[in-house]
Amino acid sequence: MGKDIKDEILSLRDAIKKWDREYYVDSSPTVGDVTYDKALLRLQYLENRYPEYKTLDSPTLKFGSDLLNDFKEIEHSYPILSLDKAYDVKELLLWVEKMSLEGSNLGFDMGISAEPKIDGCSIVLYYKDGILEKALTRGDGRFGNNVIENVRTIKNVPLCIGERVELVLRGEIYITKKDFLKINHTLDDSYINARNLTSGILRRINSREVVNFPLDIFVYDILYSSLKLNTNHDAFDKLKHFGFKLNPFCKFFCGKNLGENIINYVKEIEEQRERFEYEIDGVVLKVNDFRLRDVLGYTSHHPKWSIAYKFESLRAVSKVIDIVVQVGRSGKITPVANIEKVLIAGAFITSASLHNQDYIDSIGLNVKDVVAISRRGDVIPAVELVVEKLSVGNFKIPNYCPSCKKSLIKEGAHLFCVNIHCPLKIMGHIKYFCSKKCMNIVGLSEKTIEFLFNMNFISSEIDLYTFDFDRLIGLKGFNFKRVNKLKRSIEESKNRPFKKLLLAMGIKDLGINTILLLINNNLNSFDAISLLCQDNKNALVKLLDIKGIGERIAFNIIRAFNDKIILDKFNFFKKLGFKMQEDSMNCVIDSSFLFGKKFCITGSFDEYSRHVLIDKITKKGAIFHSAVSRYLDFLLVGKSPGLKLKKANNLGIKILSLFDIKNLVNLDD
């Protein structure tokens, strides 16, 4: 009996997987809906009756689960990098010519793949022994959230690929323009574009709900494969064989007139842009040969063997309803045009920044005017020009702050409120402090912060740690569960690295790169920085000795660490047990050899891909440079090194092998 049940379950699974492939991948179904539904219902019944036979590759998982997702944050096995960008065809052609020249010099036949750049949500799929093990969002490139339960419901994501292989794939999850408009119309809180809706669906905690949304996916890159694949073309053939959905508009180019053929393809895709059923915002080019990719390598931001050509922004016409003046955390005054809602490149636009008075005067804008609106880079709404002048004169920014009514001062082209007690500036500081890139206090959204501030519950970042949040229980939107989550998030923020706290203080010109420069020059604690800054003259000399810190930044650091308000905040956080020194694990591990050293890489390595190796070395405190210059401390050389080795030898730069590095430092700790 048991064997008969098991055999029937296996038979049903195989049949349904075959029919899914025929329908979703091959577009040639061999059975009707009734036959398919009957088989699926039978399989669901048997798996519920005999749960011991249910497996992680069952087609029934496509219908979600009633278990609630927790979206655990997990470290990516490989850094998930961005792409270099080109904004005109000349730039793109130069890149193609550069790749062709480098490939030719290294003895490679040049081939390049090209495909539309989907404007969706990036996802990384991890397969172990041929079964989907996890699905991580891009996150910050190092850590992503595991949304596997929701990704399993997407019809074109194979749960099992039929071979015991390991794969790490990048893809783009999207929703069509038509479905976006249809779904958005039914929601109480509508989304600005299809990408945001897709992201919202992916983060729903109940995967049963996700099944009801028509999410789709294109897989476009292999980050790792246990199979031997030599080219992108080989990889695409293999992915098709496994049942993944690939973009049908992807093309491979090689041979004569390479640049010309690619440019013609790009222009053709751009001309057809509005006809695509999903949003695209450019074309991505990639070197076809994987061995050449390894030689070309990576910067800390992007692979050198790929580039994204960004389309020109689409435009629409709208009318200015009102112009409001906003105040940022720095006190910067920004005029914003509120316009009649208009759809551009798949996003509803209702407002656009006007930058400053000079910009308003340059286009001659006032309330009631009809204007051309674009999304620059298909992201940022902008008023490009006045199409029809229906008002008299230009809008004038008041000479007083809309929040505190104090007089504004002009610095360059912008107006600023310099009142340290300005309510909107203070609120901006609190929002920045809580933001994901700073203290990352989950649950304290901008709306929640505005509510707490306007109700006089908080008046600075410090109040977040002294306010009794239990007072919120019973107020609209604040139940016991939500308040407890807020309290837990605030408590967890005390464990953030010191560099995050330093960034969260919002000190002018003190961004994360400058903070890392301080840390790598033994200024890795509050005590060290504040002690140095007590002696202004010595502090200036010491800070200017750090490459990358100029006079303006140095003066702002010294000024901040002599400011009583800022010092009082640091001392408050110190008493609460915040980390006031950057952990050695975040700076340098087990040896001072790599600490602060500037390095570059050439050639390929058997043990690690180049971007993984770069990540491992930078975690030890070293600083990666994408090009050889006299400022390097060493060049790391692998097999088949390029011209960087010759240049490094000419400059007298130290040459090291991976063997040399591993003799000095344990890279795998």
Swiss-Prot record:
Residues 589-669 form the BRCT domain. One of its GO terms (molecular function) is metal ion binding. Zn(2+) binds at C401, C404, C417, C422. It comes from the Bacteria. InterPro entries: BRCT_dom, BRCT_dom_sf, DNA_ligase, DNAligase_adenylation, DNAligase_N, NA-bd_OB-fold, NAD_DNA_ligase_OB, RuvA_2-like. Pfam families: BRCT, DNA_ligase_aden, DNA_ligase_OB. GO terms for biological process: DNA repair; DNA replication. Keywords: DNA damage, DNA repair, DNA replication, Ligase, Magnesium, Manganese, Metal-binding, NAD, Zinc. DNA ligase that catalyzes the formation of phosphodiester linkages between 5'-phosphoryl and 3'-hydroxyl groups in double-stranded DNA using NAD as a coenzyme and as the energy source for the reaction. It is essential for DNA replication and repair of damaged DNA. Gene3D superfamilies: 5' to 3' exonuclease, C-terminal subdomain (1.10.150.20), BRCT domain (3.40.50.10190), DNA ligase/mRNA capping enzyme (3.30.470.30), Helix hairpin bin (1.10.287.610), Nucleic acid-binding proteins (2.40.50.140). It comes from Borrelia recurrentis (strain A1). This is DNA ligase. NAD(+) binds at D33, V34, T35, Y36, D37, S82, L83, E115, R138, E172, K286, K310. It is an enzyme of class 6 (ligase). The lineage of its organism: Bacteria, Pseudomonadati, Spirochaetota, Spirochaetia, Spirochaetales. SUPFAM superfamilies: BRCT domain, DNA ligase/mRNA capping enzyme, catalytic domain, Nucleic acid-binding proteins, RuvA domain 2-like. Its EC number is 6.5.1.2. Its cofactor is Mg(2+); Mn(2+). The active site is at K117. Belongs to the NAD-dependent DNA ligase family. LigA subfamily. It catalyses: NAD(+) + (deoxyribonucleotide)n-3'-hydroxyl + 5'-phospho-(deoxyribonucleotide)m = (deoxyribonucleotide)n+m + AMP + beta-nicotinamide D-nucleotide.
